[in-house]
Amino acid sequence: PDIIVGDRIYGFLPIASHVTMIPGEVSHGGFTDTRECRAVVPPFYNEYAFTKAEPGYAPEFEEAIMLFRPLFGTSFLMQSYCEDHDFYGAKRIVVTSASAKTAMGFGYLMRKHFSGAIETIGLTSSKNKAFVEGLDCYDTVLTYDEVPLIPVGTDTLIFDIAGNADVVAALHARLGNTIPYSGAVGKTHWNAGAFGAHRDLPGAKPVFWSAPDQIAVLRERIGSGAMMRQM
């Protein structure tokens, strides 16, 4: 297949009017940009899909697709990661920045597939608490000041989407050695303390969680097509 002038593609593009790419092998579904300068990033970020070959693509929803697909895709990968690791034996997950779209998507998927098996707690600001409760994505919604209200004694995963070192430290101080995994996903609190600002936290050491790594796992196991259909 050839790339035809006028073809619309989906992928991660620079904020610019133009970009020069070097396509590798072109398939019915899309191509990969093989420029040397792009070799330092995970392969997923260099892949571009032809929208005409995308299942479920609709031109009238392009803006929504551009906004929500990467975010919900991350939510899906978070859930997949949890399943692959059997939730590290935990029965509860705490998600920070519960009003963020990625957190909402993750909460929705957990409620859909694991309601009653894995408890989810969404942490948010006081001003957003009522909104988040109305989403019905989490079993419990608490504000950041209410971390001391989380019952102790249950093994609990942490997915930190806020990127707020103080909030993570408060969670670790509260839950301690019942935290088998603590993953940093995003940074919606862009002006908060940097990752790792607090050292020697009780429980599992916070680590960066990687969506591209989980993509690689799924592609190896079920292939790209099946992964996209599941998503």
Please report, for each region that a protein language model flagged, where it lies by residue.
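Terminal helix/beta-alpha structural elements that buttress the NAD(P)+-binding lobe
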Residues: 1-231
